[in-house]
Amino acid sequence: MNQNKMLELINHLKNAGFVFQGSEIYGGVANTWDYGPLGVLLKDNILNYWKKFFVFSQNNIYMLDSKILLNSKVWEASGHVGNFNDPLIENKINNKRYRADKVIEELFPNENVAKMTHEQMQEFLQKNVTSYDNSKCAWSEIKKFNLMFETFQGVVDDKKKAIYLRPETAQGIFINFKNIQRAMRAKLPFGVAQVGKSFRNEVTPGNFIFRTREFEQMELEFFFDEETPNSYFDELVNKSYDFMLKLGLSKNNLKVRKHDQEELAHYSKATVDLEYNFPFGWGELMGIAHRGNFDLSTHSKFSNEKLEYLDPNTNKKLIPSVIEPSVGLDRLMLAILCEAYSEEKVSESDTRLVLKLDKKLSPYKVAILPLIKKFNPKANEIYSYLIDKNISVTFDESASIGKRYRRQDAIGTYYCLTVDEQSLEDNTVTLRDRDSMQQERINFKDILKFL
């Protein structure tokens, strides 16, 4: 998919009810997007499969729902207050601000920006970038720009009352480690999974829903004893890659990239990114980080609470290490949509737009199409039957049957059931497959075998 197709996809997603510009009637807010009716269904299907794949498939993974607002000391302890920042630079000619590292990466993709200090970035830009973003350049000094959104609790605007919108969901898991382990009588190794909103005041958000200031994360923190021989890190990298394939992403559009030492976050011992080939280039889709015992050790120190684990077999106390597979739900959804968006030539004079979503992800698994209104009562009977079976189904009675097929193809509906005269006689319907467009006659209750 190229950039032009990307623009076509965005326009289609808006028209079809997947994604809308946030606050659109007031001129919008940059890089905010609302999920429409079909976007909500698709997002929920991705989320539910993530839970099935990473959580419910094992008996030692537990769910948590921690809050967006945490005690500010959490972020001081985690290092986010001191370390969670971007190198911000201003072009004094056009008065625009940019992330210095991203400007260099964009213009000089072979430069290893991760190894550069802020001073080296600034010197590099002043020497090599004399024009950018349709303007001549006079670069300011680089400043550290903290990515956390700050607000105040209570009625007094007092720095002592400062509180932050969380920039990641992980810390809510770490500070609840003791509660979860005790309540669930969990033995190492075990994991805690969480889904929730996070907020980062990004300097240069963009590329549709790939990078936004408000986003949703799906994270798993897998706790284990570092001294016990294991291959958990490699296993979770492989499991994460398999997860992407099962969502319908192509191997040709995926790559595994290990972070260099200079790239590692302050908490990380090792990190691997799964990257996807988006229309705008390769971008991180999922990160698997070996965080060691940094988080639990740091929170133990700052809170004076011992976040330890007592091994029931050896009576040994230890602070567990953790491996974290983390994925942004919004950018994963974008990758899936880029992969699925297709225009097919059906004949010399006819093309169709189709979202070839994996069956488990389709917003609607089935569309009920009465051939004419006379058949609506029977169609409603079939609709109610499938709803009772917890099947995601839609009802479409307007326009010709051909136009309705195309409409359902364009939103990813996997099967269409056409109700006609014969349906009234023997309960059969015409089943049409989205991808092959093949049709066959079945009893309407047999659709369950296809799902």
UniProtKB/Swiss-Prot annotation:
Organism from which the protein derives: Mycoplasmopsis synoviae (strain 53)
Residue sites binding ATP per the record: 200-202, 210-215, 284-285, 328-331
PANTHER family: DNA POLYMERASE SUBUNIT GAMMA-2, MITOCHONDRIAL, GLYCYL-TRNA SYNTHETASE/DNA POLYMERASE SUBUNIT GAMMA-2
Record GO biological process: glycyl-tRNA aminoacylation
Molecular function as annotated in GO: ATP binding; glycine-tRNA ligase activity; protein dimerization activity
Residues the entry annotates as binding substrate: R99, E168, F215, E216, Q217, M218, E219, E324, P325, S326, V327, G328
Physiological role: Catalyzes the attachment of glycine to tRNA(Gly).
Family note: Belongs to the class-II aminoacyl-tRNA synthetase family.
Family matches, as Pfam families: HGTP_anticodon (PF03129), tRNA-synt_2b (PF00587)
Gene that encodes the chain: glyQS
Enzyme class: ligase
Cellular component, GO annotation: cytoplasm
Keywords, alphabetical: Aminoacyl-tRNA synthetase, ATP-binding, Cytoplasm, Ligase, Nucleotide-binding, Protein biosynthesis
The name this protein goes by in its record: Glycine--tRNA ligase
